[in-house]
C-alpha cells in the first residue's frame, strides 16, 4: 500500500474524529472519537517515522470542526512574463502564503507580495482555486486550499525574498 494513501486515511480519520469531538454529546462517544483521533496521530507517526510526542501536538492541536488551511497567491504579470519567487527549498512559486488571522484573502495577498517581492499590488479578481492535495502530491497532514488572485502592480521595486 502506498504511503500517501495511509496519510490520506490518517488525515481523514483525524478530521472525522475532530468533528465528532466538536459535535458529540455522549461521554462514551467522546471517548471513542478521542481514541480515533489518537490512532490517526499514531498512524501519522508511523508513516512519517516521527516520534508521537512531536506529531500529536501538531496533528491533534486544533479544536472545533476541521477546515482546510487557506493559502493565497499573487499572479503578477509584466507583459508576457509572470513573477515567481524562490522558496527556501529552492523551488519557484507565485508570491504568497498562509492567510493570516484577521486578514481577508485580498489583504493577505497584498501583504505577501510586499514581503516576498517588494511590490505593491492591487488584487483584481480570483482566477483559480486549487485543492493542493488533488493537484500536487504528496498529500499534506492538513487539507490546503490555494486561492490565486490576478494582481495589478502599483509600485515598489523587486526585492528577492530571504
Predicted regions and their residues:
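Acidic, metal-coordinating catalytic segment for phosphate/diphosphate chemistry
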Residues: 27-73
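N-terminal strand-loop-strand
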Residues: 56-93, 121, 125
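Secondary-structure edge/capping motif, primarily at the C-terminal ends of alpha-helices
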Residues: 17-24
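Long alpha-helical scaffolds
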Residues: 10, 17, 33, 37-40, ...
Amino acid at each position: 500500500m502506498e504511503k500517501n494513501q495511509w496519510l490520506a486515511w490518517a488525515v481523514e480519520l483525524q478530521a472525522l474524529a475532530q468533528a465528532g469531538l466538536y459535535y458529540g454529546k455522549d461521554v462514551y462517544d467522546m471517548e471513542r472519537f478521542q481514541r480515533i483521533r489518537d490512532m490517526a496521530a499514531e498512524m501519522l507517526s508511523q508513516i512519517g517515522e516521527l516520534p508521537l510526542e512531536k506529531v500529536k501536538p501538531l496533528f491533534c492541536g486544533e479544536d472545533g470542526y476541521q477546515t482546510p488551511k487557506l493559502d493565497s497567491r499573487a499572479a503578477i504579470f509584466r507583459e508576457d512574463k509572470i513573477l515567481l519567487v524562490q522558496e527556501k527549498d529552492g523551488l519557484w512559486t507565485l508570491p504568497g502564503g498562509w492567510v493570516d488571522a484577521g486578514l481577508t484573502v485580498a489583504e493577505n495577498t497584498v501583504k505577501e507580495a510586499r514581503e516576498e517581492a517588494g511590490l505593491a499590488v492591487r488584487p483584481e479578481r480570483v482566477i483559480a482555486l486549487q485543492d493542493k492535495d488533488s493537484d500536487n502530491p504528496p498529500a499534506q497532514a492538513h487539507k490546503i486550499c490555494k486561492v490565486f488572485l490576478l494582481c495589478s502592480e502599483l509600485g515598489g521595486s523587486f526585492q528577492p525574498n530571504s
